[in-house]
Amino acid sequence: MFYFHCPPQLEGTATFGNHSSGDFDDGFLRRKQRRNRTTFTLQQLEALEAVFAQTHYPDVFTREELAMKINLTEARVQVWFQNRRAKWRKTERGASDQEPGAKEPMAEVTPPPVRNINSPPPGDQARSKKEALEAQQSLGRTVGPAGPFFPSCLPGTLLNTATYAQALSHVASLKGGPLCSCCVPDPMGLSFLPTYGCQSNRTASVATLRMKAREHSEAVLQSANLLPSTSSSPGPVAKPAPPDGSQEKTSPTKEQSEAEKSV
C-alpha cells in the first residue's frame, strides 16, 4: 500500500516568523499616534507671544482659555510654550557669552597711547600752560604796551619789575633755551612787531637821536638870530636891526650936532 504525505494546512492563527499579529497591531498604533508638525497662523502666534510676554509659565487654566481662543488643543499650546522657553534661554545664553568677547576686540583695536618717558605728565603740562597764561595776563596788566608796538627787548625799567622777571624766568624754563641779559623772547607772542638790538645798539641810537635833536634846536635858534653861527670866528655879538628899519646911531654927540644943523 502506498501512503501519500500531505503538508498541514496553514491556519490563520499560525505564527509567522515568531511574531504574533498583536505585535504588528501595537506597532501600527504607535506609528499612528505620532504627532505631526503644527503650522501656526499669524494670529495664533501673536496671541501666544502676548501671553508669553506676560508670563513664561502659564497655568493650565490660562492654556485652556488660550487654546479655545485660537482654536488649538491645550497640548499644542503647552508644547509651544516649552519650545518658546528653550529658545529664550538659548538667546539669553548667547548674548551673555558674546558680551565679553565683544569687549576684547575693542581693546585690541584701540591700544593705550604711548607716552614719552622724558616728557612730563599731562597734568604738569596743563599746569605749566596755565601758569604761563596767568603770567602773560599779569604782565599785560602791569606793563602794557606804551605805544603802537611792543618790542621784544624792553627797556631796563621794565626788566626790573618783579612780574616781568618772573614771566621771563618761566618762559626760559618752558622753552629751555639760553637767554641773554637784554634779548629775551617775546612772551606776548608779538613776533610780527619790529625788534630792537641789544643795550649797546640802543644806547648808540639814543645818542644819535639826541645829537640830531641838539643840531635841529641850534639851527632853529640860529634862524631866529638868537645864537651865533657855529662856523663864524668868536667876536662881538651883532645886535639885531631896529624894527623901523633905520640905521643905528653912532653916539649921542653926533645926534645933537645933526639936530643943531637942521635947525
Swiss-Prot record:
Composition-biased stretches (Polar residues): 220-234
Looking up SUPFAM superfamilies in the UniProt record yields: Homeodomain-like (SSF46689)
Superkingdom classification of source: Eukaryota
Q: Main localisation, per the record? A: nucleus
* Bias (Basic and acidic residues): 89-106, 251-263
Q: Where in the cell is it found?
A: Nucleus
Entry's InterPro entries? HD, Homeobox_CS, Homeodomain-like_sf, OAR_dom, Paired_Homeobox_TFs
GO CC term, one of those recorded: chromatin
Q: What keywords sit in the KW lines?
A: Developmental protein, DNA-binding, Homeobox, Nucleus, Transcription, Transcription regulation
Segments carrying motif OAR: 204-217
Q: Which residues bind DNA?
A: 33-92
PROSITE patterns in the cross-refs: HOMEOBOX_1, HOMEOBOX_2, OAR
Pfam families in the record: Homeodomain, OAR
Instruction: List the residue ranges of the region (Disordered).
Output: 88-138, 220-263
A Gene Ontology biological process in which this protein takes part is: axon guidance
Provide any one GO MF term from the record: sequence-specific double-stranded DNA binding
Indicate, by first and last residue, each region the UniProt record lists as having compositional bias (Pro residues): 110-123
Q: Which Gene3D superfamilies match?
A: Homeodomain-like (1.10.10.60)
* Functional note: Transcription factor required for the formation of correct projections from nociceptive sensory neurons to the dorsal horn of the spinal cord and normal perception of pain.
- Report the family membership: Belongs to the paired homeobox family.
Q: How does it assemble?
A: Interacts with RGMB.
What is this protein's record name? Dorsal root ganglia homeobox protein
This protein's gene is called DRGX
